[in-house]
């Protein structure tokens, strides 16, 4: 069963899904070893590893590289925070294909305009 299928099954069968946040492959592995159901590859945490605010400063490639390394390291599903989708419809389509091909189980796209303002500031 693929990690995406595991995530879908868990979402349908569990009343609560335990998802732990990570910012790189090592922290994702710690989340997995702690018994969480999935890893949240959050843009806030990934931005923080570069000493940057979560404000659309990093590129899709930088976020993708972090999430992809988590996926290749862990056996549990990765849920990737993809901010506002990194552009228009063509960008979103490209992003979805890359993340899917890398084995990322799910993505989250915020309904905000680019450049995004961190949700904690609103």
PLM regions and their residue ranges:
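Structural preference for beta-strand elements that scaffold enzyme active sites
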Residues: 17-19, 38, 77-79, 106-108
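Alpha-helix-loop-beta-strand connector modules within alpha/beta enzyme cores
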Residues: 3-9, 13, 52-80, 102, ...
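Glycine-rich anion/phosphate-binding loops
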Residues: 20-25, 57-64, 84-102
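Glycine-rich, proline-tolerant flexible connector loops at the mouths of alpha/beta enzymes
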Residues: 39-62, 84-88, 107-122
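N-terminal amphipathic alpha-helix/helix-capping segment at the start of soluble metabolic enzymes
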Residues: 1-21, 25, 29-34
């Amino acid at each position: 069963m693929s990690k995406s299928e595991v995530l879908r099954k868990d979402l349908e069968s569990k009343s609560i899904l335990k998802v732990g946040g990570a910012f790189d492959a090592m922290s994702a592995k710690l989340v997995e070893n702690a018994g969480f159901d999935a890893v949240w590859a959050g843009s806030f945490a990934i931005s923080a590893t570069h000493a940057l605010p979560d404000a659309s400063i990093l590129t899709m490639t930088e976020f993708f590289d972090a999430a992809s390394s988590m996926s290749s390291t862990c056996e549990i599903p990765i849920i990737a925070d993809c901010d506002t989708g990194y552009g228009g419809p063509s960008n979103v389509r490209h992003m979805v294909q890359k993340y899917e091909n890398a084995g990322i189980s799910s993505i989250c796209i915020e309904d905000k305009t680019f450049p995004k303002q961190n949700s904690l500031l609103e």
